[in-house]
Regions:
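Short, hydrophobic alpha-helical segments
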Residues: 216-224
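Short beta-strand scaffold segments in enzyme catalytic cores
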Residues: 73-79, 214
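Glycine-rich phosphate-binding/hydrolytic loop that grips phosphoryl groups
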Residues: 158-161, 210-217
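ATPase catalytic-site recognition across NTP-hydrolyzing enzymes
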Residues: 4-67
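Short acidic/glycine-rich loop or secondary-structure boundary segments that cap or lie
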Residues: 36-37, 52, 71-74, 97-100, ...
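Mg2+-dependent endonuclease catalytic cores in nucleic-acid-processing enzymes, primarily RNase H-like
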Residues: 82-202, 223-236, 240-248
Length: 248
């Protein structure tokens, strides 16, 4: 059992806080989702997972997908708040769906949503193996529009790290996930690093939700997002101390 004297004077908690990320999360926060060798040890259910709330209708929406048939398809929906944070609020995760069937499921899920401002799909879905339409073309014919993803794996991983980190002003992470998005939460918590490339994840692990998230975060957002960036620049300017003596 825990030593009550250590608990009383805070030494025990201080000791737990000094542990490596994975051990600290397990013993101090009770978070056993993050695995040894995980690519994202900074991920925390306490910080990064939230319960459902009604997304404001004026937050731009983004949809991103990784397509598979024998392997699962994953579609993620996110909303961008006025501080340019992303809230991943819905996921669709299923095997053995044709491109037409997946498009129908997406349209069904979005019936009550505002139209997404940004839509991104694995760029390999534009490849053709014969004379027929590509996967992307089939879905677009069904009324589900897409743009090709940026497939840069290393930059995509780094963008996830950046989003998981706290904003220096708000002290809050730049991305959060609804608790109903179980597959992306599971994969971000547990996906391991590559054994041959420390800058990438293990591509042999289940990574379909991870890939969809990577595509989402690598999207070159414009319009509303550029307004968010302008607001962020104004906020940065307001917080910036111009003179160390007088503070202006």
């Amino acid at each position: 059992t825990d030593n009550p004297h250590l608990m009383a004077d805070g030494q025990y908690e201080a000791m737990l806080r000094s542990l490596p990320d994975v051990e600290r999360k397990r013993l101090l926060e009770g978070d056993w989702d993050v695995a040894e060798g995980a690519a994202f040890p900074e991920f925390s259910r306490v910080k990064h997972v939230v319960e459902h709330f009604d997304i404001p209708t004026n937050w731009p929406r983004i949809r991103a997908a990784d397509y598979g048939y024998s392997a699962p398809s994953c579609v993620l929906w996110g909303a961008i708040d006025w501080d340019n944070n992303i809230w991943v609020y819905r996921e669709l995760y299923a095997k053995h769906l044709t491109a037409e069937q997946l498009a129908d499921r997406i349209l069904e899920a979005e019936q009550l949503d505002p139209l997404p401002h940004y839509t991104v799909l694995d760029s390999s879905c534009w490849n053709k193996t014969g004379f027929g339409p590509s996967i992307a073309e089939v879905m677009m014919r069904q009324g589900v529009r897409w743009t090709p993803s940026d497939r840069n794996r290393v930059q995509g991983k780094m963008e996830i790290h950046r989003r998981l980190a706290d904003d220096p002003y708000s002290q809050e992470p730049r991305i959060r996930f609804f608790s109903s998005c179980q597959n992306i939460v599971k994969q971000i918590a547990g996906i391991p690093l590559s054994k041959t490339n420390s800058e990438d994840v293990d591509t042999k692990a289940e990574d379909h939700a991870y890939d969809a998230l990577r595509y989402m975060l690598m999207t070159r957002m414009s319009g509303y997002a550029s307004i968010h960036q302008q607001l962020g620049a104004i906020k940065n300017h307001v917080h910036k101390v111009q003179d160390e003596v007088f503070g202006y």
